Amino acid sequence: MDAHFVGEVDVRWLVESGEDRKMQLLSDFAFVDSNNVRWEAKKNDVIDGASIPEVIWSQIVGTPFIGDYRRASVVHDVACDKRMHTSKDAHRMFYEAMLADGTPQPRALLFYTAVRLFGPQWEKTVGPTSIKFKSTLLSSSPIAVLDFNRLEQALDEVLGVDNK
């Protein structure tokens, strides 16, 4: 089965001091990856959109709540908060969810690289163990230069991640 989203993102803004970016989900939402793993974002979970520094908001990168990566950012936010899988798995799911939602691969690779390098990192999980993703979906591209698996290996080396 192809990777897909389940449900619609329905949120309420939470009023707070400061950036005022947090939202509460009003209904369940999920992403089912190519391995049929269901990444849940439950009703009442709190999200804050894509963590894009304001200094690089533009037509190319986008803002936290506008862009073809919004739904992927919802399940990624929750995956990072709940830590049911390793950070590497959560970030790979984010990449796959962006592709499933129509994000062009160059942008999805840019966001994946940014989140692997500068996003949250953890190894131990609170729930299921690390999962293996189908490399065919993650590396398929009409542009041969954009090879996800090679990028991931390079990021693993930079981050000192042991590939088991």
Residue ranges of model-derived segments:
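Extended terminal accessory/targeting regions
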Residues: M1-K164
